[in-house]
């Protein structure tokens, strides 16, 4: 498999302490991600940093003319060959598999594999993108920032590994919003999460696999 051996290009958010992190492809960037980035920069650009990991398919170029140029935002990216998603197998026997086509709006195996990967790739990379001292909040790209947050609250929330609880079922943690934490605990969490996510993708996959790994 090659998905865990990719060369990550672009700029890591070096020397940035408080970071909002998300990942998306160009279409999701145009529809959602850019608004999350713009709103975060508008309300919190002076005290935080935005890092975006872009996922491109063959023939798509990483061009700043389609992105936001700002000192408070950095980008890394990966680009896939045409047959990239052929390396994955779908677990059609898993009890929750049927929810995937419903949520993703497709019954096409290729498209489903792609959407599952797009939703999970961000977790495979945190140990490569961020240093042990960086406070990171990883969120879904379709969110939006509505106000200015106090930096001491941001650091308090992101000091330890933590995840958002599912609003309708607080006993369940969801992957929509997590912090890996800082220090040795944060480093261990990022590495363990990346390794377990990579291991999961070496087996048949399904929608919700990221939440189950978490």
Name each region found by the language model:
Residues 1-104, 131-132:
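N-terminal anchoring/stem segment of glycosyltransferases
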Residues 22-33, 115-119, 203-207:
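Aromatic-acidic/polar surface patches that form glycan- and anion
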Residues 34, 38, 120, 124, ...:
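A structural signal for well-ordered alpha-helical segments within the folded catalytic domains
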Residues 107-115:
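Surface-exposed cleft-lining segments at the edges of enzyme active sites
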Residues 114-172:
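GT-A fold catalytic core of metal-dependent nucleotide-sugar glycosyltransferases
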Residues 147-151, 175, 191-196:
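A short secondary-structure junction signal
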Residues 169-190:
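Substrate-binding rim/cap in mid-to-C-terminal beta-strand-loop elements of soluble/periplasmic
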Residues 184-214:
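Catalytic core and acceptor-binding pocket of nucleotide-sugar-dependent glycosyltransferases
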């Amino acid at each position: 498999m090659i998905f865990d051996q990719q060369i990550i290009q672009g700029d890591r958010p070096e020397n940035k302490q408080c970071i909002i992190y998300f990942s998306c492809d160009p279409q999701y960037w145009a529809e959602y991600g850019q608004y999350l980035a713009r709103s975060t920069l508008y309300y919190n650009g002076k005290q935080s940093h935005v890092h975006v990991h872009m996922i491109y398919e063959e023939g798509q170029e990483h061009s700043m003319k389609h992105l936001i140029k700002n000192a408070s935002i950095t980008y890394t990216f990966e680009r896939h060959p045409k047959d990239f998603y052929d390396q994955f197998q779908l677990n059609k026997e898993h009890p929750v598999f049927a929810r995937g086509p419903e949520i993703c709006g497709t019954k096409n195996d290729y498209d489903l594999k792609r959407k599952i990967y797009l939703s999970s790739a961000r977790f495979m990379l945190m140990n490569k993108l961020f240093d042990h001292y960086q406070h990171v909040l990883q969120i879904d790209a379709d969110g939006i920032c509505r106000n200015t947050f106090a930096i001491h609250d941001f650091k308090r929330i992101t000091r330890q590994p933590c995840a958002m609880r599912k609003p309708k079922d607080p006993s369940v943690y969801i992957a929509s919003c997590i912090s890996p934490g800082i220090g040795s605990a944060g480093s261990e969490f990022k590495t363990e999460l990346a390794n377990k996510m990579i291991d999961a993708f070496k087996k048949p996959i399904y929608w919700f696999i990221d939440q189950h790994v978490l």
